[in-house]
Amino acid sequence: MSDPESPLWVATLLRHHKELKQRQGMFQSRHMEFFRFKRFVRALNSDEYRAKSEREPEKYPPVRSEEDARDVFVSLIKAQLVLPCTKLHTAQCREHGLAPSKDYPHLLLSTKATLDADEYYVWTHNPKTLTDYLTVVGVIVGILAFVCYPLWPHSMKRVVYYLSLGLLGLLAVFSALALVRFVIYVLSLAFCSERGGFWIFPNLFEDCGVIASFKPLYGFGETECYGYIKKQKRRKRKLEKKKQ
């Protein structure tokens, strides 16, 4: 007799399985991970699941055929651990009053699960990970350490004092750099306005890594900015798709 908690055990085991190749999308205004049905079948046929199934068949039902895989997946749907969904395209997003996003595609709940190979499903099961527990412990320890600051030894207080001064110094340097950078840009417009002005660290406020923010050392206009280059690459990909 199978364990009534079997769907939960299966979902927990395969929640972050590499075979799912899951992505993040926006489902009911929340970031949720979704995958294709055929990917879940592959995860059920993986060595990891097979080994678990052989040791604990009550928790992890054996999968010997495609029909077995469908039965296991249906049990997850009935337990509402996964839900069928549709990935909306740009035009469909606008029809539903949603802003299209390439990074996080919008997902719409489907009324029926057909179990087609390319049908999308979204996870509603989000078990706590070790990282989540460590984060909670870290926050609690941090709060207790802050509350107990008066009891700290003098040497530790001195270290915190110098660290605070260092952080304030970095903030002051960054603010001064931003101010000097802007002043130089405004002055440069009188000499090279046709090139978009002269920038020191053109990527300083771009959405990129810390090291990339300071590369290149200087540039003209926005043509060397990370955001502009990324936008041009997207435009190029769109043109190539249209040609195809």
Swiss-Prot record:
Annotated organism of origin: Eremothecium gossypii (strain ATCC 10895 / CBS 109.51 / FGSC 9923 / NRRL Y-1056)
Gene Ontology cellular component list: endoplasmic reticulum; membrane; Sec62/Sec63 complex; translocon complex
Cytoplasmic side: 1-132, 180-244
Membrane topology: Multi-pass membrane protein
Record carries keyword Transport: yes
PANTHER family, per the entry: TRANSLOCATION PROTEIN SEC62
GO MF annotation terms: protein transmembrane transporter activity
Protein role: Required for preprotein translocation.
InterPro entries, per the entry: Sec62, Sec62_asco
Residue intervals annotated with topology Lumenal: 154-158
Key words of the record: Endoplasmic reticulum, Membrane, Protein transport, Translocation, Transmembrane, Transmembrane helix, Transport
Compartments where found: Endoplasmic reticulum membrane
SUBUNIT field: Part of a complex that contains SEC61, SEC62, SEC63, SEC66 and SEC72.
Entry protein name: Translocation protein SEC62
Principal location listed in the UniProt entry: endoplasmic reticulum
Chain ranges passing through the membrane: 133-153, 159-179
GO process terms (BP): post-translational protein targeting to membrane, translocation
Family statement drawn from the similarity comment of this UniProt entry: Belongs to the SEC62 family.
